[in-house]
Curated annotation (Swiss-Prot):
<dbReference type="InterPro" id="IPR027417">
    <property type="entry name" value="P-loop_NTPase"/>
</dbReference>
<feature type="domain" description="Obg">
    <location>
        <begin position="1"/>
        <end position="159"/>
    </location>
</feature>
<dbReference type="InterPro" id="IPR045086">
    <property type="entry name" value="OBG_GTPase"/>
</dbReference>
<keyword id="KW-0479">Metal-binding</keyword>
<feature type="binding site">
    <location>
        <begin position="191"/>
        <end position="195"/>
    </location>
    <ligand>
        <name>GTP</name>
    </ligand>
</feature>
<dbReference type="InterPro" id="IPR006169">
    <property type="entry name" value="GTP1_OBG_dom"/>
</dbReference>
<comment type="subunit">
    <text>Monomer.</text>
</comment>
<keyword id="KW-0378">Hydrolase</keyword>
<dbReference type="Pfam" id="PF01018">
    <property type="entry name" value="GTP1_OBG"/>
</dbReference>
<dbReference type="InterPro" id="IPR036726">
    <property type="entry name" value="GTP1_OBG_dom_sf"/>
</dbReference>
<dbReference type="InterPro" id="IPR031167">
    <property type="entry name" value="G_OBG"/>
</dbReference>
<dbReference type="GO" id="GO:0003924">
    <property type="term" value="F:GTPase activity"/>
</dbReference>
<dbReference type="InterPro" id="IPR006074">
    <property type="entry name" value="GTP1-OBG_CS"/>
</dbReference>
<dbReference type="Pfam" id="PF01926">
    <property type="entry name" value="MMR_HSR1"/>
</dbReference>
<keyword id="KW-0963">Cytoplasm</keyword>
<keyword id="KW-0460">Magnesium</keyword>
<feature type="region of interest" description="Disordered">
    <location>
        <begin position="128"/>
        <end position="147"/>
    </location>
</feature>
Length: 372
């Protein structure tokens, strides 16, 4: 199935039915009085988070979703039937914004989370409500209220604990397939990965975390070059980023340090908060480096890159070093999970406050110095 992570739809709630201005007319009841019923309420539009859905493709082509109107009231104090509600099922991780006002309507973070996005109109009142001691035969009634109508922007931000960064062919897909249950397409050409892949890494009974692989970044990605920029939003919810570097590129003219610096630069240009996330350096493809050159090449890379954070040396293909990295990730996430959840909640609250005022991850990673 094609991966779609953005869509625009229109949701239209049903109008309320009109009240009835009816009089009771029966044999032997000369002054029956008013008996007009109320109109039914209009149907509302809800969204529900569903963990079994992983793309917004259903909403790329079905752009209008309408609930039914309420029925009009009738005589004999018969109320109109309420309109049926419409329920839209969306992936967990979907962010819903009102395109006209910029209001953040919902952030679907839990399975079965239900949110009202367009409220149906109230039904009108029948003339029975207007009966009084001085008005025994009222002819007044009210019309139903119109339902809400909204243009919504849907954005899917996958929910993962760990995100993978790196140039195309850095070995990200090989790594995620080696340590998790994900089975991404793997080949020796750039941009084999065209959509985010999620994998569950199981460390032990009841111990696991989710890792996300996005298409590789290239220089200029923040301005739209390549594929990775359109998927960087999927890393915004992660608690840890792994920066994978190909330490043994096939093209000897390629400088891994220059590529790594380009990735960091693109990350910073795209989103400063994403740049500030905890980030570990993972030097991959050590199996392609002669054993007597490995230490020299690793030390040279770290010095030229100016990196002072955690460093892991692995071979995703052979599995060398992967187990230690996985356990280190799990321990880190277990230690910082509460802080990361608090940060996500604060980010969401800040976003809401900002939008209201305008009308329209994890603890900070301390580094003495960072790569430029």
């Amino acid at each position: 199935m094609k991966f779609i992570d953005e869509a625009r739809i229109e949701v239209i709630a049903g109008d309320g039915g009109d009240g009835s201005a009816s009089m009771r007319r029966e044999k032997f009841v000369p002054f029956g009085g008013p008996d007009g019923g109320d109109g039914g309420r209009g149907g509302s539009v809800y969204v529900i988070a569903d963990r079994n859905i992983n793309t917004l493709i259903d909403y790329r082509y079905a752009k209008k979703h309408m609930a039914r109107n309420g029925e009009n009231g009738r005589g004999s104090d018969c109320y109109g039937k309420g309109g049926d509600d419409v329920t839209l099922r969306m992936p967990v991780g979907t962010v819903i914004n009102d395109m006209d006002t910029g209001e953040l309507i919902a952030d679907l973070t839990e399975h079965d989370q239900k949110v009202l996005v367009a409220k149906g109109g109230a039904g009108g009142l029948g003339n029975l409500h207007f009966k009084s001691s001085t008005n025994r035969a009222p002819r007044q009634k009210t019309d139903g209220k119109p339902g809400e109508r909204r243009m919504l922007k849907l954005e899917l931000k996958v929910l993962a604990d760990v995100g993978l960064l790196g140039m195309p062919n850095a070995g990200k897909s090989t790594f995620i397939s080696s340590v998790s249950n994900a089975k991404p397409k793997i080949a020796d050409y750039p941009f084999t990965t065209l959509a985010p892949n999620l994998g569950v890494v199981r460390v032990g009974p009841g111990k696991s975390f989710v890792i996300a692989d996005i298409p590789g970044l290239i220089e200029g990605a923040a301005e739209g070059a390549g594929l990775g920029h359109q998927f960087l939003r999927h890393l915004q919810r992660t608690g840890l980023l792994l920066h994978l570097v190909d330490l043994a590129p096939f093209d000897e003219s390629v400088d891994p340090v220059a590529e790594a610096k380009a990735i960091v630069g693109e990350l910073r240009k795209y989103d400063e908060s994403l740049y500030q996330k905890p980030r570990w350096l993972v030097l991959n493809k050590l199996d392609m480096v002669p054993e007597d050159e490995r230490r020299t090449r690793v030390v040279d890379f770290i010095e030229r890159f100016g990196w002072t954070g955690p460093v892991f040396e692995i071979s995703a293909l052979t599995g060398q070093g992967c187990e230690g990295l996985v356990y280190a990730i799990y321990d880190y996430l277990a230690e910082h999970s509460d802080a990361h959840r608090a940060e996500l909640a604060e980010d969401l609250a800040s976003d809401v406050r900002f939008r209201d005022a305008s009308g329209a991850g994890g603890e900070p990673h301390e580094r003495e110095a960072d790569a430029p």
